[in-house]
Design a protein with these regions (language model features):
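Conserved histidine-centered catalytic loops in small-molecule metabolism enzymes
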Residues: 341-376
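Short beta-strand scaffold segments in enzyme catalytic cores
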Residues: 32-41, 159-160, 366
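Active-site ligand-binding patch in enzyme domains
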Residues: 146, 157-163, 167-299, 307-310
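Flexible, gly/pro- and Lys/Arg-enriched active-site loops
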Residues: 314-352
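Zn2+-dependent cytidine deaminase-like catalytic core
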Residues: 37-136, 263, 313
């Protein structure tokens, strides 16, 4: 297995990553993958995985190339699969097409693959190289990769606040702290997530739909994705007291709703896309995330109030903290960002490290990782 890469290798893998990104709103629970086939320095085929059950990126690129695939180098953003699932193995497809070399951005930690795809290629006499633009490939599939490695989804906690760290007026009024551009960005982030997590308190207070509103997408994304192709996230509602009712706006949008609680209730009054997810009383977030991982939830976008935000942080259940900051001051009577009732000493305050800072219209979008996850 070779690991020496040329400038052309980097160029074509970058294109494969750009193709893979086109699937980020549609592929879950599968990863987003792109593939480029190159022969004599020219692209002869390319493709990306669009949706679970449809052809994988390698198969799309091979179909695009036809007979020109023979003798080509395949650049793929994730190790080709080697098992029969909803579709045949991609490693086998590359072998049958007669490609001369395969370059993978990274190995696939999926236990069904995990080096078996590269071995299948090697056994067929096809040289391969791995770990080209690995960090970019990892960033593209944070949810899938975490679930494969730990059995749990990648959790992004979204918060919106004023310059003085407030999320709403004392009365609860919060529409809208941030501007139109930031709220449109939230729609994109919702669409990338497998599931959206909130609480019955939020449902009762705001009666939100918690769906992806395609009409708020930027024009370039609308041109790229028809409304019916964008995946709606599973709406997961923590509802320990069974307070959510069929009349709530959640059920006016036909996408799955999972009500998480410990007390069985009559689900026959709810639409058929709603189910109750029963967990033991006083369950913790580790158990919840493990159960969601078993249900093939790759990533979770959290939108809730200060209670859930604080609880997730205290239980170290947040992989990424995303804060939208509006250029407003709400005063000391306004509501705070998160509740951390057990925090008494400054030395014990959770530490986060800024990863990205982006201007979104008149607002800022800040992305943080927990300090314990940061590589030295």
């Amino acid at each position: 297995m070779s690991d020496t890469f040329s400038p052309d290798d980097v160029k074509f893998m970058q294109l494969a990553l750009e193709l893979a990104a086109k699937g980020q709103y549609t592929t879950a629970p599968n990863p987003s993958v792109g593939c480029v086939l190159v022969k004599n320095g020219e692209i002869v085929g390319k493709g990306f995985h669009f949706k679970a059950g449809q052809p994988h990126a390698e198969r799309v690129a091979l179909a695009d190339a036809g007979e020109k695939a023979k003798g080509a180098t395949a650049y793929v953003t994730l190790e080709p699969c080697s098992h029969y699932g909803r579709t045949p193995p991609c490693a086998l497809g590359l072998i049958e097409a007669g490609v001369s070399r395969v370059v993978a951005a990274m190995a696939d930690p999926n236990p069904q693959v995990a080096g078996k795809g590269l071995k299948m290629l090697a056994d067929a006499g096809i040289p391969s190289a791995v770990n080209l633009l690995n960090e970019q490939a990892e960033a593209l599939n944070k949810g899938f990769l975490k679930r494969m490695r730990t059995g749990k989804p990648y959790v992004q906690l979204k918060l919106a606040m004023s310059l003085d760290g407030r999320t709403a007026m004392a009365s609860g009024e919060s529409k809208w702290i941030t501007g139109d551009v930031a709220r449109a960005d939230v729609q994109k982030m919702r669409a990338k997530a497998t599931a959206l997590l909130s609480t019955s308190a939020t449902v009762l207070a705001d009666d939100p739909s918690l769906n992806v509103r395609w009409n708020q997408f930027p024009d370039d994304l609308k041109a790229e994705y028809a409304e019916d192709t964008v995946r709606q996230p599973i709406r997961i509602i923590l509802d320990s007291k069974n307070r959510v009712q069929p009349s709530h706006q959640l059920f006016h949008t036909h996408s799955p709703v999972w009500l998480v609680g410990s007390i069985p209730r009559d689900m026959s009054v709810f639409p058929d896309f709603c189910e109750q997810m029963l967990l033991p009383e006083n369950y913790d977030f580790d158990l919840l995330m493990t159960e969601l991982g078993k249900r093939q939830v790759n990533s979770i976008w959290v939108e809730a109030g200060a209670n859930l935000a604080g609880s997730l942080i205290e239980q170290h259940a947040v992989d990424e903290l995303i804060i939208y900051v509006a250029p407003k001051l709400l005063g000391d009577n306004a509501r705070g960002l998160c509740q951390l009732p057990h925090l008494e000493k400054l030395a014990d305050a959770p530490l986060w490290q800024l990863q990205e800072c982006e201007r979104i219209g008149d607002d800022l979008k800040l992305s943080y990782l927990p300090n314990l996850l940061i590589k030295e």
